[in-house]
């Protein structure tokens, strides 16, 4: 469970950053 808790946030942050980059890149 510890590894899952550590992996989920990282993936979530990466996804959020990716989505943010797409939102900023798309006017």
Curated annotation (Swiss-Prot):
Domain of life: Eukaryota
EC numbers: 3.4.23.-
Enzyme category, top tier: hydrolase
Statement: the UniProt record of this protein carries the keyword Hydrolase: yes
Disulphide bridges, residue numbers: none
Entry's Gene Ontology BP terms: proteolysis
Alphabetical keyword list: Aspartyl protease, Glycoprotein, Hydrolase, Protease
Tissue/organ expression: Placenta.
Annotated coiled-coil segments of the chain: none
Keyword Hydrolase in annotation: yes
A GO molecular-function descriptor: aspartic-type endopeptidase activity
Post-translational modification note: Glycosylated.
Family label: Belongs to the peptidase A1 family.
Name of the protein in its database record: Pregnancy-associated glycoprotein 59
Species, as recorded: Capra hircus (Goat)
